[in-house]
Amino acid sequence: MKTAVCSALLVAASMIAGIDGAAAQAGAISDDVVKIGVLTDMSGQFSDESGEGSVTAVRMAIEDFGGKVLGKPIELVVADHQNKPDIASGIARKWYDVEHVDMIANLINSSIALSVTQMAKEKNRIAIVNGAGSSRLTNEACTPNSVHYSYDSYALARGTGSALAKAGQKSWFFLTADYAFGHALEADTSAVVKALGGEVVGSTRYPIETFDQSSFLLQAQASKAQVVALAGSGTVLVNAVKSAQDFGIRRGGQTLAGLLVWVTDVKSLGLETAQGLVLTDAFYWDRDDQTRAWSKRFYERMKKMPHMGDAGDYSSTMHYLKAIEAAGTDEAQAVMAKMRELPINDFFATNGRIREDGRMVHDMYVYEVKAPSESKGDWDFYKLREVIPGDQAFRPLRDSLCPLVKKG
């Protein structure tokens, strides 16, 4: 009799615990909605590298996840930061404080990303960076609330810088965009070149609003450097490559290195102009069957092939939603812990992982742009030169200045 009573009590307790657990899970999503904000450049010089493509990639991830997580709807909001840090900060603050956005995505433009990731820490929300590239985001400016996902200036430098320096291209001149990412890209690439016995013979910086780079290219040409490195991105990089072609930089024997080249940049340039460019990328649409399958879906919506920012926006959003599901809540620190715990295996990365500094570690790829005669069709732009394993592509934790990294 006593045993029967105890059994009945245990069953009742289990039922109550189950009800309480279900209730807890049902209430685990703040405001009964998971809200994701894409804060990006919708109309400016980086809009082709972010903009509507980033929005589409995040929307695809939400749809593929089923539109709900833990039984609650996933909502998408979008804003154009216009490449102005004050506007971006105002939007991010309103999103976090008033509109209760849980995660802000993309964040192209390093100055903006550095500001918003610090705000995410302050507000205990999450920021996932795919557009911006400054390696400071996971170095001295790391936060426990942010992830730097697809690439950074260190990995780009490690790829393109080492590939050319090892091939005997030891003297470099930098044509650098005068903003946070350009500075980081020049610094990281210079360090790689010097470590391999090379030298930087000169550099010049130009405002990112500059579209005529003739005077800067004349300096590069006069330097007689073996490599003219373009440390910038977007329309300014496209214009620089076109101008370099007009000035005969490569015809004069100098190598032109694009330190951040998006596949959409190559499309804008055309193979006749872009051929021979050496670049480092995290994603290429034609890499394998998985990348081709996802890229085909993206192309059907955007009428252009995706680049690493688009692919990273999709992959990181899916990973974020999976982490919410695994954590049973959208509370930022619980979700961040799951994001660091769960491996990333999809079309973007194999055995990817997020370190304590917020860096997502995955393989990087060094490509060379094909000559027109080598291309088999539209968007067939790259030939693979080298695969850089993730543990070699990104800054080692032993060299990190991130205060979250435990050493010794």
Question: Predicted segment positions?
Answer:
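Short, low-complexity disordered leader/linker segments with a strong preference
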Residues: M1-V34, L404-G408
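Immediate post-signal peptide segment of exported/extracytoplasmic ligand-binding proteins
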Residues: A23-V38, G67-E75, A165-K170
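Extracytoplasmic "Venus flytrap"
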Residues: A28-R59, A79-D86, I108-N109, L175-H183, ...
